[in-house]
Amino acid sequence: MEAPRPAGTFVVVGGGIAGVTCAEQLAVSFPEEDILLVTASPVIKAVTNFRQVSKVLEEFDVEEQPGTMLESRFPNIKVIESGVKQLKSEDHCIFTEDGREFVYKKLCLCAGAKPKLIYEGNPRVLGIRDTDSAQEFQKELAKARRIMIVGNGGIALELAYEIEGCEVVWAIKDNAIGNTFFDAGAAEFLTSKLMSEKSEAKIAHKRTIYTVEEAKKETRTKSKADYVGSALGPDWHGGLALKGTEEFSHSVHIETRCEVKKIYLEEEFKIMKKKSLAFPKDHHKSVTADKEMWPVYVELTNGTIYGCDFLVSATGVTPNVHPFLHRNNFALGEDGGLRVDDQMRTSLPDIYAAGDICTACWQPSPVWQQMRLWTQARQMGYYAAKCMAAASMGHPIDMDFSFELFAHVTKFFNYKVVLLGKYNAQGLGADHELMLRCTRGQEYVKVVMQNGRMMGAVLIGETDLEETFENLILNQMDLSSYGEDLLDPNIDIEDYFD
């Protein structure tokens, strides 16, 4: 007779922010039910110090913790430390890498995303996605004199600013840095900070990093090559010493409008008899041949070649859907994520998805868009749990308010950065206006207006405008009569709209 299969009313896959938030919320809603959290990683990502800054803006820290800490906080959560080998959606069960089978009534897939690594398998190309890869990077950086960063997202931005004592060549395919987050004006504001020597003392980081014990690492059920850790948290570099071998503070050269064409190891490069460039030492960026030899050479599509100790691939992520697709006819979004509706349901019955793995396919609010960021992972995980609970009890549920307005607060180059609504005029066409206020080295304020209404904003620095602008975007009030006064620093804009 076949042994009974362990059943959980609710099974969540993924130990990142979306998965852990979903499991926690389900545990609160159903204290008598066992909630199974299946994760390939020996540590989970927990939200701590959560603070609702305004109606939609939120701040929190991300802490790595052993799964046992989650189980002690929620006695009805059982953490299963293993990757998923197969999902049989028709049978409502999953098989884990360690050979176990779990039956579910409702399943939420929160397996995150994988880095798009250029030249996978090359020992001189590092990707930074999880704590293990960040620590590997720190180890390599300690021996490095020069590295190249390829990519223009959040991790690339933070690396370019945080690395000290090492020459950094930063290759981006766009005209300006931080294209995902900023227009050319904001990029210029930040670039001046990047190119100046860092004088200010670093702000102490509140976030703690939990280091996995060596013994735990040895007992992992998956080989390191296959292991996909959940993404790094905000301030992920806070516990790392990002220092190269040299004594100078900061040295960055940006190559714009280019991508990697080819990578050569040292021996291969000698045979090719090509010329590489020395690191530009002056503001005029005079070009001279490099006399030094390097372990790896990177040829860019603009024709330039630089030698370096290693290359960091920070070119974005792809949804980690692969473990779940075999014999399961999921509908996928254009970006490869699992399509979800306004109740976080995938195209298969009783299967939900949240966080980086999913693609939001509902009709969005005019001032919201999906971006694979920490805040949305938490919001989606929380809302998915609410939807699963409502469906289990046969109750209707309204869309969560957090999807009314895109709102994200972060830090770049030691500046507070707030992004609201269509902050880069995404999808607005030519029919919009921009209003700007900039104090070099202090603050940058950009507002996106359409038909007299505020549609988005970028706030860099301590502007104290986020709550007022959030309300103006949500209310869609006609602001035509205020004109330039909206950004006049001598007028307290909050007084207008009390």
UniProtKB/Swiss-Prot annotation:
Residue positions where N-acetylmethionine is found in the record: M1
Enzyme class: oxidoreductase
Single GO molecular function: oxidoreductase activity
Any GO CC annotation of this UniProt entry: nucleus
Location relative to the cell: Nucleus; Cytoplasm; Cytoplasm, Myofibril, Sarcomere
Record GO biological process: cellular response to oxidative stress
Necessary cofactors: FAD
Comment on bound cofactor: Binds 1 FAD per subunit.
InterPro entries: FAD-bd_OxRdtase, FAD/NAD-bd_sf, FAD/NAD-binding_dom, FAD/NAD-linked_Rdtase_dimer_sf, Rubredoxin_C
Function of the protein: Probable FAD-dependent oxidoreductase; involved in the cellular oxidative stress response. Required for normal sarcomere structure and muscle fiber integrity.
Protein family per UniProt: Belongs to the class-I pyridine nucleotide-disulfide oxidoreductase family. PYROXD1 subfamily.
Protein name: Pyridine nucleotide-disulfide oxidoreductase domain-containing protein 1
Source organism per UniProt: Mus musculus
